[in-house]
Amino acid sequence: MKQYLDLMNKVLAEGTPKADRTGTGTLSIFGHQMRFNLQEGFPLVTTKKCHLRSIIHELLWFLNGDTNVAYLKENKVSIWDEWADENGNLGPVYGKQWRAWGTADGRQIDQLTTVLNQLKQDPDSRRIIVSAWNVGELDQMALAPCHAFFQFYVADGKLSCQLYQRSCDVFLGLPFNIASYALLVHMMAQQCDLEVGDFVWTGGDTHLYSNHMEQTQLQLTREPRALPKLVIKRKPASLFDYRFEDFEIEGYDPHPAIKAPVAI
């Protein structure tokens, strides 16, 4: 995960001080890309311990089309708590857009099922895309989508994915995002009888919050370790039938966790 540390160094060296929605302040660059060959290991940051339970449960929550934090709280995942209302609702965030995008004529489009069918029936299509950026519903969302748009690509029997992330919290959020989409690629590949290819991450406003600088400097003193391996223990009937227990990470030997405040 040297690419991740290189990005941190780039933001520190080249970033522009900017105000932001949270009032915290950032150092920011615009436009950055990283490529991870998923054949070479699972891209889970090793220079600090990442909370894999949260990553897996959040993705399963998205895949279920859920937009209430009850499932997350039942599984001791608190990453969305700050944005939920008193009933645990978040509005039409990722799960709603991925599984039930509303159309002007009242239909709902299950983008993930559509994409799965495309991968199986027309893998050379250039339209294998999922978008969470629903302009008509942004004002109803507790938080506008940060990881907004992703595209799949099949070549030589391998499935690759590119994500466009319009806003990226490099210290706290990005390790989660990389691991989450890498996990999704593995799941989609298994369902489509493909090997995994690359995960390509593309960032828009890519920033370090001003109250993450000490933590960033600490992380940059640490040497990356070997990437772990993802094992999926069974092949469920569909993409939407995976359970937390289906996933195992082998050989994850991270440096200790580094705590930092979330900008809300």
From Swiss-Prot:
Can you tell me which residues bind dUMP? R21, R126, R127, R166, S167, C168, D169, N177, H207, L208, Y209
User: Mind telling me which Gene3D superfamilies this protein's record contains?
Assistant: Thymidylate synthase/dCMP hydroxymethylase domain
Q: Which Enzyme Commission numbers does its entry carry? A: 2.1.1.45
Please list the residues that make up the active site. C146
One Gene Ontology biological process: dTMP biosynthetic process
Q: Where is the signal peptide?
A: none
Catalytic activity, per the record? dUMP + (6R)-5,10-methylene-5,6,7,8-tetrahydrofolate = 7,8-dihydrofolate + dTMP
> What subcellular compartments does it reside in?
Cytoplasm
Using the UniProt record, name the top-level EC class of this enzyme in a single word.
Answer: transferase
Listed under GO cellular component are:
cytosol
Any one Gene Ontology MF annotation carried by this entry is:
thymidylate synthase activity
Keywords in alphabetical order: Cytoplasm, Methyltransferase, Nucleotide biosynthesis, Transferase
Binding sites annotated in the UniProt record for (6R)-5,10-methylene-5,6,7,8-tetrahydrofolate: H51, D169, A263
Q: Which InterPro entries does this UniProt record tie to the protein?
A: Thymidate_synth/dCMP_Mease, Thymidate_synth/dCMP_Mease_dom, Thymidate_synth/dCMP_Mease_sf, Thymidylate_synthase, Thymidylate_synthase_AS
**Pfam families for this protein:** Thymidylat_synt
Pathway note: Pyrimidine metabolism; dTTP biosynthesis
Per UniProt, subunit arrangement is:
Homodimer.
Q: What family does the entry list? A: Belongs to the thymidylate synthase family. Bacterial-type ThyA subfamily.
Mind telling me which PANTHER family this protein's record contains? THYMIDYLATE SYNTHASE, THYMIDYLATE SYNTHASE 1
Its function?
A: Catalyzes the reductive methylation of 2'-deoxyuridine-5'-monophosphate (dUMP) to 2'-deoxythymidine-5'-monophosphate (dTMP) while utilizing 5,10-methylenetetrahydrofolate (mTHF) as the methyl donor and reductant in the reaction, yielding dihydrofolate (DHF) as a by-product. This enzymatic reaction provides an intracellular de novo source of dTMP, an essential precursor for DNA biosynthesis.
Query: Could you tell me what this protein is called?
Result: Thymidylate synthase
Origin species, per record, is Serratia proteamaculans (strain 568)
